[in-house]
């Protein structure tokens, strides 16, 4: 959904070990974003849907659950949004995303994979594209030093497996101080990754709007003074 000229979309990057393709961090087409906005099971590579659904069903039948990853791409955020310290773009987005239940981790750009590379491999060279300055690659995920670079903002959020499963689990009895077993009754989602996509999408929208309002409020105050 749009925030002015800002657009963001999420997709299911993985369910368990079944993976979808990731966003091209440099070139994300409007057509892809539009297609993802109309789908209930949001995938870049639609052929991943069947094995993902089969894995979820297997977990349901075995009274278990499975986690996964949601990837988000944000286009059109102006250059210079954010702060180099505590109000950086990563800080604000992460704070909002960690408010979503079951989120256990977040990475931006090349993330943890980038930690395996040399600086010469992970750095993003700047180039002119007409009158616009861009980077050839986007390992920084659209954020440098807490401030937007104008490239697409890319992050991935890890969703843990649903804790409420119908299998017997070891626990403790607080009254008797003894070890015991817990058996949960009722209906529980075997995978909440699919449900998490629109939640993370809207949490992201709030974070980006908050960042942009801060930026333009400061500019307005400077202009008034």
Regions found by a protein language model. Name each.
Residues 62-179:
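Glycine-rich anion/phosphate-binding loop at the beta-strand->alpha-helix junction
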